[in-house]
Amino acid sequence: DLKHARLLTELIPHAMRIKSEGTEHLVAIGGGFMEVTPDKITILADSAELPENIDVDRAKSAYKRAEDRINSYKNSPKESEIDIRRAEAALARAKARLLVKNIPVN
């Protein structure tokens, strides 16, 4: 019987393998929180997408747009830190979607 140490942590956008009732799923998580208690783990995700619900072309386009925004922001002193963080979050969400679809990204 597995027991976990207590933990509450923020989740960044990423690909996550979730096992529930003996079934394993690969899911693109758009950020959120995870609470670990001795007997269970609870994930409160901003968004969660299964591979069959991900549009690859849309994810690739979002990835490219976010990369372009980040590169242009780095060369522009006018851009605010929040704009850069938003672009980085969009890039991470797109990357998670592509990884869940088994498409390699940088």
Language model segments and positions:
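Compact, glycine-rich, soluble single-domain proteins
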Residues: 1-60, 65-67
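Acidic/glycine-rich phosphate/pyrophosphate-binding loops and surrounding catalytic core
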Residues: 49-106
